[in-house]
């Protein structure tokens, strides 16, 4: 290893690691230290195989970094290793997926015979020096093409032997050496970019780019690409590879002051039901909850597995360059990079290989909810000089997007015998986009003819956002959806009939839930809007809220709510529950996850009870024994398979109050003592932390609700009259909500106005 020059030995070292191989390398200060480390790493790797098709990188283990591995890219980073002797440098290999791209080396040339440009196919005209010729590949080009930097680039394999010529710079921006050459705009050569072909009349001899035969005729002899100038026969258009090269500003120019563009750019709103970044319990509080003394150990209040309220993803489904135009303006042919993501089609102006799209250059966003239909075009071209488009996207705004170009029409239809060059090509972008958009507009269901009519009826009314999962229940999954005619966001519960048992208990529960929702009408209960049934699925459409009570609890710094917010939410729950009980309905699965909130950004939102999958019609003085609900919120009589009535909901209310004020569950199921014994042990049920900060009246209400004896359990009427749920501040909070909602009073009464004074 060459260490000539001024060096200073630190007496330290680093460890190069490649797989299971480790080697200690002395750390010295030298201008070429990074190159020396890379060379030694290359020698280690070459002992296991060749590096011809792979790139090598060094990463330092940085445990304080979120990524754990920190790339080593500059010599200045080497000096910091002296502060951390013995650090490990990981050798990472990455396969090369790119072809070596090098520029032509051209010089002016005089031709004695007719010669055509190898780029555009037109005849090189003139007496002397008609064009330029590459010394390496002997290809000929127009002089004007030479000035288009990044276009005259070839993929040469194998590489020429005369590297001296290749090392000479051809253009100002392409001066890198052979394998390091990568002009930014030449990256587009590696992207499948379609040509924008239009009929053209040629005044000079021109050959076809595909077959090298002359374009014959007096007028409109062939097709010319609007962007790169390539010329082809009509019959050869289908065989032209999608390798168009765009010059500067070749993609449609966009005026971002246009209201249409502003609307598209401003639609990147945060989707509903997305968890905020701070919905986590801080580590110090979580640690305090988990490390309590064993005698008062509680379960930390968190969402059970499989009950996450929001599963919003930003999954990219399909992308690629597409040619399109609006039916009302067929002359304006546009070329954009289409990407399906977030339940919308994004049309980007810029795309670079390895970098991706430029998010600041969005031409338009087409939400799936605005698409009414996707229709294949089998007719003639809108304009005779352009090929027919492949399919149409029709929207609720009466805008029709014509997508793709059908080159088969120029040759009189698809060829009977597919050329060998075409047989290995994948399905065209237009075909994939047509099928994908058509499938995306359908609700999640089986693809069979029996379901087609019912699924089409539902798809015409609602667009299900299948990548925005709101939650899951015992029989189905809840998705976000858009009502097409109004744009209103709703929640759709997709129920799979396959989950129903053969005995029919599942179907009975589902029908009971729908029947209950159809009979209820209360501001505190989620509203049923629509129901549709296919052979294997049932779609239940309900109004959508912006979160649930559990999310609100977990979003707090201490993982619990204060008394004022708890009382505000509790009165709304009790009023809705009283309405259900008056209708003879027991919810049977009351818990924070099933209490939806109108606004996660407010401390005093409206609440609505949802998920009536376990709800039962229980008349007065009758009991049931069927299994219902979530065990953590159920009273002993249900867990012990004894008879229960509507008072089981009051037990659930007591558990909700407990977990809301403390952040933990009231009972430890792992203890050998029974629930009744745990209730009698006040020090176990209400430890000093955090119950010393809670009013004694709240503890009194919880104790009266968590009674093992059904008869001793507080009724809903007495609960609403309890002293903890009275007070001027609570009255004003509830009355303010009623005024904001502009609904008839359902939380307060005129007697409260007399007692506390009217709201000012």
UniProtKB/Swiss-Prot annotation:
Keywords, alphabetical: ATP-binding, Cytoplasm, Kinase, Magnesium, Membrane, Metal-binding, Nucleotide-binding, Phosphoprotein, Repeat, Serine/threonine-protein kinase, Transferase, Ubl conjugation, Zinc, Zinc-finger
GO molecular function, one term: zinc ion binding
CDD domains: C1_CeDKF1-like_rpt2, PH_PKD, STKc_PKD
Keyword Kinase: yes
Cofactor(s) for this UniProt protein: Mg(2+)
Catalysed reactions listed for this entry: L-seryl-[protein] + ATP = O-phospho-L-seryl-[protein] + ADP + H(+); L-threonyl-[protein] + ATP = O-phospho-L-threonyl-[protein] + ADP + H(+)
GO cellular component, one term: cytosol
EC nos: 2.7.11.13
Domain PH: 316-444
One Pfam family recorded for the sequence: C1_1
Zn finger residue spans: Phorbol-ester/DAG-type: 103-153, 194-244
Domain description: The PH domain inhibits PKD catalytic activity in the absence of DAG, either by direct steric occlusion or distortion of the PKD catalytic cleft.
Membership in a protein family: Belongs to the protein kinase superfamily. CAMK Ser/Thr protein kinase family. PKD subfamily.
Protein name: Serine/threonine-protein kinase dkf-1
Organism: Caenorhabditis briggsae
Gene: dkf-1
């Amino acid at each position: 290893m060459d260490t000539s020059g001024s060096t200073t030995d630190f007496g330290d070292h680093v460890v190069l690691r490649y797989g299971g191989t480790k080697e200690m390398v002395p750390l010295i200060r030298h201008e070429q230290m990074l190159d020396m480390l890379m060379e030694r790493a290359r020698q280690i790797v070459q002992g296991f195989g060749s590096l011809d098709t792979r790139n090598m990188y060094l990463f330092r283990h940085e445990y304080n970094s979120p990524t754990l591995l920190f790339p080593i890219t500059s010599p200045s980073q080497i000096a910091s290793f002296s502060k951390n002797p013995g650090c490990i440098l990981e050798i990472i290999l990455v396969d090369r997926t790119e072809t070596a791209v090098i520029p032509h080396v051209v010089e002016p040339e005089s031709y004695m015979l007719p010669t055509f440009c190898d780029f555009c196919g037109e005849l090189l005209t003139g007496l002397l020096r008609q064009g330029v010729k590459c010394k390496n590949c002997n290809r000929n080009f127009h002089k004007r093409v030479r000035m288009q930097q990044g276009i005259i680039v070839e993929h040469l394999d194998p590489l020429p032997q005369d590297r001296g010529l290749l090392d000479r710079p051809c253009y100002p921006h392409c001066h890198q050496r052979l394998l390091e050459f990568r002009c930014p705009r030449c990256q587009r050569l590696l992207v499948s970019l379609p040509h924008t072909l239009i009929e053209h009349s040629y005044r000079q001899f021109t050959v076809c780019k595909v077959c090298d035969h002359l374009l014959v005729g007096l007028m409109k002899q062939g097709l010319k690409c609007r962007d790169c100038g390539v010329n082809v026969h009509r019959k050869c258009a289908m065989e032209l590879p999608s390798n168009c090269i765009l010059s500067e500003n070749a993609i449609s120019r966009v005026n971002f002051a246009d209201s249409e563009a502003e609307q598209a750019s401003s639609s990147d709103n945060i989707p509903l039901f997305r968890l905020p970044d701070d919905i986590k319990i801080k580590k110090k509080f979580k640690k305090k909850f988990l490390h309590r003394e064993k005698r008062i150990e509680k379960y930390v209040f968190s969402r059970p597995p499989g009950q996450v309220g929001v599963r919003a993803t930003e999954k990219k489904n399909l992308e690629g360059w597409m040619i399109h135009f609006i039916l009302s303006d067929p002359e304006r042919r546009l070329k954009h990079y289409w990407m399906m993501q977030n339940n919308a089609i994004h049309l980007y102006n810029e795309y670079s290989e390895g970098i991706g799209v430029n998010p600041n250059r969005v031409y338009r966003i087409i939400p799936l909810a605005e698409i009414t239909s996707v229709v294949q075009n089998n007719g003639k071209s809108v304009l005779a000089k352009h090929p027919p488009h492949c399919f149409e996207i029709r929207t609720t705004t009466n805008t029709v997007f014509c997508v793709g170009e059908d080159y088969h029409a120029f040759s009189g239809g698809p060829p009977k015998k597919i050329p060998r060059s075409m047989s290995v090509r994948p399905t065209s972008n237009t075909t994939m986009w047509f099928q994908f958009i058509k499938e995306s507009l359908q609700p999640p269901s089986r693809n069979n003819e029996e379901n087609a009519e019912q699924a089409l009826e539902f798809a015409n009314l609602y667009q299900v956002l299948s990548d925005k999962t709101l939650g899951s229940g015992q029989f189905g999954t809840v998705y976000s959806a858009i009502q097409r005619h109004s744009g209103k966001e709703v929640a759709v519960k997709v129920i799979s009939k396959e989950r129903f048992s053969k005995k029919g208990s599942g179907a009975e529960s589902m029908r009971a839930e729908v029947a209950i929702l159809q009979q209820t009408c209360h501001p505190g209960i989620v509203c049923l809007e629509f129901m549709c049934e296919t052979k294997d699925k049932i779609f239940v459409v309900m109004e959508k809220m912006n979160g649930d009570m559990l999310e609100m609890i977990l979003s707090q710094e201490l993982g619990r709510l204060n008394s004022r917010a708890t009382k505000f939410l509790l009165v709304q729950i009790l009023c809705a529950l009283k309405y259900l009980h008056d209708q003879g309905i027991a919810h049977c699965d009351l818990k924070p996850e099933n209490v939806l909130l109108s606004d996660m950004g407010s401390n005093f939102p409206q609440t609505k009870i949802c998920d009536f999958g376990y709800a039962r019609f229980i008349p007065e003085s009758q009991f049931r024994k069927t299994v219902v609900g979530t065990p953590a919120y159920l009273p002993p009589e249900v867990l012990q398979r004894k008879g229960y009535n509507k008072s089981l909901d009051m037990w659930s209310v007591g558990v909700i109050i407990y977990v809301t004020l403390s952040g933990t569950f009231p009972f430890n199921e792992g203890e050998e003592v029974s629930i009744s014994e745990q209730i009698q042990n006040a020090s176990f049920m209400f430890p000093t932390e955090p119950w010393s900060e809670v009013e004694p009246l709240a503890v009194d209400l919880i104790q009266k609700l968590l009674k093992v004896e059904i008869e001793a359990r507080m009724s809903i009427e007495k609960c609403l009259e309890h002293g903890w749920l009275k007070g001027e501040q609570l009255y004003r909070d509830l009355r303010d909500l009623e005024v904001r909602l502009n609904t008839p009073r359902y939380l307060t009464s005129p007697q409260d106005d007399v007692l506390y004074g009217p709201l000012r």
